[in-house]
Amino acid sequence: MRKNFGKKTWLYPMPVLIVTTYNEDGTPNAMNAAWGGVYDTDQIMLCLSQDHRTTGNIRARGAFTVSIADAAHAEACDYVGMVSGRKVPDKLARAGLHTERAETVDAPVIRELPLALECRLVRFNEDGI
């Protein structure tokens, strides 16, 4: 059955985007991002609050990865999005997820997830990165 949402700027269903970075001390960090999408033919854009540790990590290192959750890891990825890395520094391990260094950028990738975009920060503005 079709549903009319009126004029909106969002798409459904939205994938769960897991953004991973390295913290200052080199430990992996991850957060779920609800707002992101295609910016150009070879760029994506994320809308992240400046309050997130992940945002600071991206600005400091200039790199991050974006993975998309799959059905097999939905519960683990949901946990990553619900728990703050400031309160639970090992939240990836507690979720049963493991990371390895990305091939082309200074950021981790989550081994269990089938897709990872390796990204470099091109620009930052108050509308998103």
Predicted features along the sequence, with ranges:
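Active-site-proximal mixed secondary-structure blocks
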Residues: 1-31, 37-129
